[in-house]
Protein backbone atom coordinates (compact mmCIF):
# COMPACT_ATOMS: atom_id res chain seq x y z
CA UNK A 1 0.00 0.00 0.00
CA UNK A 2 1.49 3.32 -1.06
CA UNK A 3 0.67 6.30 1.13
CA UNK A 4 0.49 10.06 0.78
CA UNK A 5 1.97 11.61 3.89
CA UNK A 6 0.52 14.56 5.78
CA UNK A 7 0.37 16.07 9.27
CA UNK A 8 -2.53 17.45 11.29
CA UNK A 9 -2.55 19.25 14.61
CA UNK A 10 -5.32 19.16 17.17
CA UNK A 11 -6.86 22.03 15.22
CA UNK A 12 -6.04 20.17 12.02
CA UNK A 13 -2.79 21.93 11.26
CA UNK A 14 -1.77 20.07 8.12
CA UNK A 15 1.74 19.57 6.90
CA UNK A 16 2.91 16.93 4.52
CA UNK A 17 5.94 15.08 3.27
CA UNK A 18 6.94 12.39 0.77
CA UNK A 19 4.18 10.98 -1.43
CA UNK A 20 3.23 8.79 -4.35
CA UNK A 21 0.31 10.00 -6.45
CA UNK A 22 -1.04 6.45 -7.00
CA UNK A 23 -2.00 6.24 -3.34
CA UNK A 24 -5.53 6.33 -2.00
CA UNK A 25 -4.45 6.75 1.61
CA UNK A 26 -3.19 9.61 3.75
CA UNK A 27 -0.90 9.42 6.75
CA UNK A 28 -1.99 12.08 9.23
CA UNK A 29 -0.61 13.21 12.55
CA UNK A 30 0.22 16.47 14.23
CA UNK A 31 0.80 18.87 17.04
CA UNK A 32 -1.73 18.33 19.82
CA UNK A 33 -3.50 15.40 18.17
CA UNK A 34 -3.39 12.18 20.18
CA UNK A 35 -2.49 9.88 17.30
CA UNK A 36 -0.93 9.31 13.92
CA UNK A 37 -3.48 7.81 11.54
CA UNK A 38 -3.75 6.33 8.08
CA UNK A 39 -6.94 7.56 6.44
CA UNK A 40 -8.64 6.26 3.32
CA UNK A 41 -8.62 9.22 0.95
CA UNK A 42 -11.90 8.22 -0.69
CA UNK A 43 -13.93 7.50 2.46
CA UNK A 44 -11.92 9.80 4.80
CA UNK A 45 -12.14 7.08 7.46
CA UNK A 46 -9.25 6.07 9.75
CA UNK A 47 -7.91 2.60 8.89
CA UNK A 48 -4.82 2.53 11.16
CA UNK A 49 -3.67 4.62 14.08
CA UNK A 50 -0.76 4.90 16.49
CA UNK A 51 -1.29 6.70 19.83
CA UNK A 52 0.83 9.71 20.81
CA UNK A 53 1.45 10.99 24.30
CA UNK A 54 -0.25 14.14 25.54
CA UNK A 55 1.83 17.23 24.85
CA UNK A 56 3.75 15.84 21.88
CA UNK A 57 4.04 18.27 19.01
CA UNK A 58 4.27 16.22 15.82
CA UNK A 59 5.11 18.54 12.92
CA UNK A 60 6.65 15.98 10.56
CA UNK A 61 5.67 12.46 9.57
CA UNK A 62 6.79 10.24 6.70
CA UNK A 63 6.50 6.73 5.30
CA UNK A 64 9.95 5.22 4.77
CA UNK A 65 10.97 3.07 1.77
CA UNK A 66 10.55 -0.08 3.91
CA UNK A 67 7.02 0.95 4.96
CA UNK A 68 7.91 2.07 8.48
CA UNK A 69 6.73 5.40 9.85
CA UNK A 70 9.06 8.23 10.82
CA UNK A 71 7.82 11.16 12.88
CA UNK A 72 9.09 14.06 14.95
CA UNK A 73 7.73 15.04 18.33
CA UNK A 74 8.87 17.88 20.54
CA UNK A 75 11.33 15.77 22.53
CA UNK A 76 12.74 13.72 19.67
CA UNK A 77 12.13 11.66 16.54
CA UNK A 78 11.03 8.05 16.26
CA UNK A 79 10.92 5.30 13.67
CA UNK A 80 8.16 2.74 14.26
CA UNK A 81 6.73 -0.24 12.39
CA UNK A 82 3.11 -0.70 11.35
CA UNK A 83 2.88 -3.10 14.31
CA UNK A 84 3.73 -0.17 16.64
CA UNK A 85 7.23 -1.45 17.48
CA UNK A 86 9.88 1.20 18.07
CA UNK A 87 12.89 0.76 15.77
CA UNK A 88 14.78 3.72 17.23
CA UNK A 89 14.25 6.96 19.11
CA UNK A 90 16.60 9.96 18.90
CA UNK A 91 16.04 12.48 21.68
CA UNK A 92 16.44 16.24 21.40
CA UNK A 93 18.45 17.94 24.17
CA UNK A 94 16.60 19.50 27.09
CA UNK A 95 15.07 22.83 26.06
CA UNK A 96 15.20 22.01 22.35
CA UNK A 97 12.31 21.05 20.03
CA UNK A 98 12.59 18.36 17.36
CA UNK A 99 10.48 19.70 14.51
CA UNK A 100 11.74 18.02 11.32
CA UNK A 101 11.79 14.34 10.34
CA UNK A 102 11.79 13.58 6.62
CA UNK A 103 12.98 10.92 4.18
CA UNK A 104 15.73 12.03 1.81
CA UNK A 105 15.91 10.91 -1.85
CA UNK A 106 18.86 8.63 -1.03
CA UNK A 107 16.81 6.75 1.57
CA UNK A 108 18.43 8.32 4.62
CA UNK A 109 16.52 10.55 7.02
CA UNK A 110 16.82 14.25 7.84
CA UNK A 111 16.13 15.35 11.42
CA UNK A 112 16.33 18.86 12.86
CA UNK A 113 15.73 20.44 16.24
CA UNK A 114 15.35 24.07 17.29
CA UNK A 115 17.62 25.28 20.06
CA UNK A 116 21.02 26.70 20.97
CA UNK A 117 22.52 25.67 18.73
CA UNK A 118 19.91 24.52 16.25
CA UNK A 119 20.95 21.16 14.81
CA UNK A 120 20.36 19.26 11.57
CA UNK A 121 21.26 15.57 11.38
CA UNK A 122 21.22 12.93 8.69
CA UNK A 123 20.74 9.38 9.93
CA UNK A 124 20.37 5.99 8.28
CA UNK A 125 17.58 3.44 8.65
CA UNK A 126 19.27 2.02 11.76
CA UNK A 127 19.22 5.44 13.43
CA UNK A 128 22.98 5.83 13.13
CA UNK A 129 24.04 9.48 12.81
CA UNK A 130 25.83 10.09 9.50
CA UNK A 131 26.31 13.86 9.76
CA UNK A 132 25.52 16.69 12.16
CA UNK A 133 25.25 20.41 11.43
CA UNK A 134 25.02 22.98 14.21
CA UNK A 135 24.07 26.58 13.45
CA UNK A 136 22.77 29.71 15.17
CA UNK A 137 19.38 31.06 14.09
CA UNK A 138 19.83 34.20 16.27
CA UNK A 139 16.20 33.71 17.37
CA UNK A 140 15.78 33.71 21.15
CA UNK A 141 12.83 31.33 21.53
CA UNK A 142 13.37 27.81 20.12
CA UNK A 143 9.64 27.53 19.34
CA UNK A 144 9.91 30.59 17.06
CA UNK A 145 12.78 29.19 14.99
CA UNK A 146 11.54 26.69 12.38
CA UNK A 147 9.31 23.72 11.61
CA UNK A 148 10.41 21.89 8.46
CA UNK A 149 13.97 21.95 7.17
CA UNK A 150 14.65 20.62 3.67
CA UNK A 151 17.75 19.73 1.65
CA UNK A 152 18.44 21.08 -1.84
CA UNK A 153 20.16 19.42 -4.81
CA UNK A 154 23.40 21.22 -3.95
CA UNK A 155 23.54 19.35 -0.64
CA UNK A 156 22.77 22.40 1.49
CA UNK A 157 19.88 22.88 3.91
CA UNK A 158 16.96 25.26 3.43
CA UNK A 159 15.67 26.55 6.76
CA UNK A 160 12.40 28.56 6.83
CA UNK A 161 12.56 30.80 9.89
CA UNK A 162 9.37 31.86 11.64
CA UNK A 163 10.46 34.89 13.63
CA UNK A 164 12.59 36.58 10.95
CA UNK A 165 10.44 35.78 7.88
CA UNK A 166 13.27 34.39 5.81
CA UNK A 167 14.59 31.30 4.08
CA UNK A 168 18.22 30.57 4.91
CA UNK A 169 20.54 28.28 3.01
CA UNK A 170 22.96 26.58 5.41
CA UNK A 171 25.96 24.48 4.34
CA UNK A 172 26.70 21.10 5.99
CA UNK A 173 29.45 22.89 7.93
CA UNK A 174 26.89 25.34 9.38
CA UNK A 175 27.88 28.32 7.24
CA UNK A 176 25.16 30.77 6.17
CA UNK A 177 25.30 30.85 2.36
CA UNK A 178 22.23 32.92 1.48
CA UNK A 179 19.10 34.45 2.99
CA UNK A 180 15.90 35.56 1.27
CA UNK A 181 13.11 37.49 2.99
CA UNK A 182 9.51 36.35 2.43
CA UNK A 183 6.04 37.23 3.72
CA UNK A 184 4.65 35.93 6.98
CA UNK A 185 6.21 33.17 9.06
CA UNK A 186 7.35 30.51 6.56
CA UNK A 187 6.62 26.92 7.58
CA UNK A 188 8.05 24.85 4.73
CA UNK A 189 9.85 24.96 1.40
CA UNK A 190 9.19 22.54 -1.49
CA UNK A 191 11.28 22.21 -4.64
CA UNK A 192 9.70 22.42 -8.11
CA UNK A 193 11.00 20.77 -11.28
CA UNK A 194 11.81 24.18 -12.78
CA UNK A 195 14.32 24.93 -10.02
CA UNK A 196 12.08 27.32 -8.09
CA UNK A 197 10.58 26.69 -4.67
CA UNK A 198 7.10 26.87 -3.21
CA UNK A 199 7.10 28.59 0.17
CA UNK A 200 4.21 28.28 2.64
CA UNK A 201 3.92 31.71 4.28
CA UNK A 202 1.97 30.80 7.42
CA UNK A 203 -0.06 33.67 8.86
CA UNK A 204 0.36 35.73 5.68
CA UNK A 205 -2.48 33.51 4.36
CA UNK A 206 -0.66 32.83 1.10
CA UNK A 207 2.02 30.81 -0.62
CA UNK A 208 4.57 31.88 -3.20
CA UNK A 209 6.74 30.46 -5.93
CA UNK A 210 10.23 31.77 -5.24
CA UNK A 211 13.32 32.00 -7.42
CA UNK A 212 15.73 31.52 -4.56
CA UNK A 213 18.79 32.53 -6.57
CA UNK A 214 17.42 35.98 -7.47
CA UNK A 215 14.99 36.41 -4.58
CA UNK A 216 12.18 37.16 -7.04
CA UNK A 217 8.59 36.07 -6.37
CA UNK A 218 7.43 34.36 -9.55
CA UNK A 219 3.81 34.02 -8.43
CA UNK A 220 1.73 34.45 -5.32
CA UNK A 221 -1.53 32.72 -4.35
CA UNK A 222 -3.49 34.78 -1.85
CA UNK A 223 -6.20 34.06 0.69
CA UNK A 224 -9.18 34.06 -1.69
CA UNK A 225 -7.57 33.04 -4.97
CA UNK A 226 -8.75 29.39 -4.90
CA UNK A 227 -12.45 29.00 -5.64
CA UNK A 228 -14.24 27.11 -2.85
CA UNK A 229 -11.47 27.60 -0.30
CA UNK A 230 -10.00 30.28 1.91
CA UNK A 231 -6.38 30.17 3.01
CA UNK A 232 -5.59 30.67 6.67
CA UNK A 233 -2.20 29.63 8.11
CA UNK A 234 -0.53 27.90 5.15
CA UNK A 235 1.61 25.23 6.77
CA UNK A 236 2.99 22.99 4.05
CA UNK A 237 2.82 22.53 0.32
CA UNK A 238 3.23 19.21 -1.49
CA UNK A 239 3.70 19.42 -5.27
CA UNK A 240 2.32 16.46 -7.24
CA UNK A 241 3.94 14.88 -10.25
CA UNK A 242 0.96 15.80 -12.43
CA UNK A 243 1.36 19.51 -11.69
CA UNK A 244 -1.20 19.56 -8.90
CA UNK A 245 -0.59 20.58 -5.32
CA UNK A 246 -1.67 19.75 -1.79
CA UNK A 247 -2.07 22.76 0.50
CA UNK A 248 -2.11 22.36 4.26
CA UNK A 249 -4.40 25.02 5.67
CA UNK A 250 -4.37 25.43 9.47
CA UNK A 251 -7.37 27.22 10.98
CA UNK A 252 -5.86 27.66 14.44
CA UNK A 253 -5.29 31.42 14.46
CA UNK A 254 -8.85 32.26 13.38
CA UNK A 255 -11.60 31.41 15.84
CA UNK A 256 -14.32 31.61 13.19
CA UNK A 257 -12.66 29.31 10.65
CA UNK A 258 -13.89 26.02 12.10
CA UNK A 259 -17.52 27.19 11.96
CA UNK A 260 -17.65 27.16 8.16
CA UNK A 261 -16.52 24.92 5.34
CA UNK A 262 -12.97 26.14 4.99
CA UNK A 263 -10.97 23.06 3.98
CA UNK A 264 -8.06 22.12 6.20
CA UNK A 265 -6.38 20.17 3.43
CA UNK A 266 -6.80 21.26 -0.17
CA UNK A 267 -5.83 19.51 -3.39
CA UNK A 268 -5.67 21.65 -6.52
CA UNK A 269 -4.88 20.63 -10.08
CA UNK A 270 -2.35 22.24 -12.39
CA UNK A 271 -4.88 24.91 -13.32
CA UNK A 272 -5.33 25.92 -9.67
CA UNK A 273 -8.83 24.42 -9.34
CA UNK A 274 -9.73 22.62 -6.11
CA UNK A 275 -10.40 18.94 -6.87
CA UNK A 276 -10.47 17.45 -3.34
CA UNK A 277 -10.55 18.66 0.24
CA UNK A 278 -10.65 17.52 3.84
CA UNK A 279 -12.54 19.40 6.54
CA UNK A 280 -13.25 17.33 9.65
CA UNK A 281 -12.97 19.14 12.97
CA UNK A 282 -15.19 16.58 14.69
CA UNK A 283 -12.76 13.71 14.10
CA UNK A 284 -9.42 15.46 14.12
CA UNK A 285 -9.80 18.41 16.46
Could you say what each language-model-derived stretch is?
Residues 1-4, 8-23:
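Bacterial Sec-dependent signal peptides at the C-terminal "C-region" and cleavage site
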Amino acid sequence: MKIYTFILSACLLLVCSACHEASHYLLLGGSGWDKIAIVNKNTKEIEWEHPLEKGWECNSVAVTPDRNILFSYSKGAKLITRDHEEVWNISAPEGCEMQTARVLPNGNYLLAWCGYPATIMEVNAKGEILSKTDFDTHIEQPHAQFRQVNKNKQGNYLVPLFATSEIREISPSGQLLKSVKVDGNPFSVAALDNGNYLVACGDAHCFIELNFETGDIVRKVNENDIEGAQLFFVAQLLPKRDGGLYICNWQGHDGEAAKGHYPQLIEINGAGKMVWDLNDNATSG
